[in-house]
Amino acid sequence: MEKTVEIYTDGSCLGNPGPGGYGIFMIYNEHEKKLSQGYKLTTNNRMEMLGAIVALEVLTRPCVINITTDSQYVKQGIESWITNWKKRGWLTSAKKPVKNVDLWKRLDLACAKHTVTWKWVKGHSGHKYNEIVDDLARDAAGSKDLLDDVGYQP
C-alpha cells in the first residue's frame, strides 16, 4: 500500500525578479520534514513551482500526495493548463512560449510518479502550515547560501 504524504509548499521572492526561495513542510504519520533553499535571481512563480517539484522529487517511492499551495499559478497550471500546453508543443493559446517551461516539464514528470491531489489555501490567512512554509521560503530567500536558478530567463 502506498504511503499518504501531506505536503505544504510556498515560494517567496524579494523583488520579483530578485533573490527568492522555497519552503516545504512534509508530514507522513508522525514524521515531519522541512526543506528550503534560496536562489540569487529568480521569480516568485519559479519558487512556488520549485517547492512543489523538490517535495515530490525527494520521495523515493510512489506515494499518495495531498499537496497544499497558496499559488493559483501552480495549481491551475498543473491541473488545467499543462494539457493544452503539451498538445501545442509548449505554446500558450496565444502561440507564445510557455514561461518557466523547464519547471513545468519537471513538475509534470514528478507528478507522474505519484497520485497527487492539489489543494489551494489563501496565503497569509493564518493557515498553520502555510505560515510555516512562508517563513521557510522568506528565510531561504534572505539567506547567504543562495544558488543560481539556471533556468531563469529574464
UniProtKB/Swiss-Prot annotation:
Belongs to the RNase H family. Endonuclease that specifically degrades the RNA of RNA-DNA hybrids. This is Ribonuclease H. Residues 1-142 form the RNase H type-1 domain. It comes from Pseudoalteromonas translucida (strain TAC 125). GO terms for cellular component: cytoplasm. Gene3D superfamilies: Ribonuclease H-like superfamily/Ribonuclease H. Mg(2+) 1 binds at residues 10, 48, 70. It is found in: Cytoplasm. Mg(2+) 2 binds at residues 10, 134. Binds 1 Mg(2+) ion per subunit. May bind a second metal ion at a regulatory site, or after substrate binding. InterPro entries: RNase_H (IPR050092), RNaseH-like_sf (IPR012337), RNaseH_domain (IPR002156), RNaseH_sf (IPR036397), RNaseHI (IPR022892). SUPFAM superfamilies: Ribonuclease H-like. Its EC number is 3.1.26.4. One of its GO terms (biological process) is DNA replication, removal of RNA primer. Monomer. Its cofactor is Mg(2+). Its main location: cytoplasm. One of its GO terms (molecular function) is magnesium ion binding. Keywords: Cytoplasm, Endonuclease, Hydrolase, Magnesium, Metal-binding, Nuclease. It catalyses: Endonucleolytic cleavage to 5'-phosphomonoester.
